[in-house]
């Protein structure tokens, strides 16, 4: 029976399914056809890490990637395969017809484009029209705001971006200007040269940092590993390595 399961799983790797967004490599067999974002399994990456950093439940991850529960107990990843971490849901048809023209939000004097989802911040003064394939993280990064801000200003989107609707406007800036910007690379004032590689290394640093590092980030309160890696343009796996 075990050999039949492995044979069936291998056949799944050879199947050519169509996806909403094509993965850059081999997808895990059975991955959701509506997948719009992928992560590659590599050494040190676990299902739990994926759940936490992409804001999903165990059940959602298994639903989008049924193969993780087919190779033994618990959640199992196969190195180098791509796993689905986001699915673009088709929004339900609204029961009302959005107006064709823009309207002024009551009280703040800012003209608000339509349609918008319910629960948008009343003091919003900057808007973005969502298109198919967008993700909350990509929008927040492009607009220079944090995911926390995006979720706070657009409560209908949900805390995992599951209800982000294409062709609707969301808020990406407010009048008060109280935003949390994505982390930026900052050099410490005191520096010392790392032995052997000739690169000036800022201090203080944590032990175990790569000896051939040539780019640094000063961690501030509220930083997360995923946000730092994304802002610096490096893979989360490289960051942990």
UniProtKB/Swiss-Prot annotation:
Domain LysM: 37-85, 126-172, 215-241
Record keywords: Chitin-binding, Repeat, Secreted, Signal, Virulence
Knockout or disruption consequences: Leads to enhanced fungal virulence, with faster decaying on infected fruits.
InterPro entries linked to this entry: LysM1-like, LysM_dom, LysM_dom_sf
A GO-annotated cellular component: extracellular region
Coiled-coil residues: none
Domain free text: The LysM (lysin motif) domains are small globular domains involved in binding chitin in eukaryotes. LysM8 contains 3 LysM domains.
Name the record gives this protein: Secreted LysM effector LysM8
Source organism (scientific name): Penicillium expansum
Taxonomy of the source species: Eukaryota, Fungi, Dikarya, Ascomycota, Pezizomycotina
Name of the gene this protein is made from: LysM8
């Amino acid at each position: 029976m075990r050999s039949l399961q492995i044979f069936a799983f291998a056949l799944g790797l050879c199947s050519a399914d169509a996806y909403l967004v094509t993965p850059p490599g081999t997808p895990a067999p059975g991955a959701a056809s509506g997948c719009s974002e992928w992560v590659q399994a590599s050494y040190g990456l676990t299902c739990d890490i994926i759940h936490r950093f992409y804001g999903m439940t165990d059940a959602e991850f298994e639903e989008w990637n049924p193969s993780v529960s087919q190779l033994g107990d618990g959640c199992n990843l196969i190195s180098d395969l791509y796993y689905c971490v986001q699915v673009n849901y088709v929004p339900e048809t609204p029961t009302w017809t959005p107006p064709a023209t823009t309207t002024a939000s009551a009280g703040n004097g800012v003209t608000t484009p339509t349609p918008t989802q319910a629960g948008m911040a009343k003091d919003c003064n900057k808007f973005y029209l969502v298109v198919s394939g967008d993700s909350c993280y990509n929008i927040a990064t492009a607009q220079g705001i944090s995911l926390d801000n995006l979720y706070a200003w657009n409560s209908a989107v949900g805390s995992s971006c599951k209800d982000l609707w294409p062709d609707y406007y969301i808020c990406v800036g407010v009048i008060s200007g109280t935003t949390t910007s994505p982390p930026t690379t900052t050099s410490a004032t005191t520096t010392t040269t790392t032995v052997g590689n000739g690169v000036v290394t800022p201090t203080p640093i944590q032990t175990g940092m790569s000896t051939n590092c040539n780019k640094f980030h000063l961690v501030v309160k509220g930083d997360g590993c995923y946000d730092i890696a994304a802002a610096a343009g490096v893979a989360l796996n490289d960051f942990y390595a």
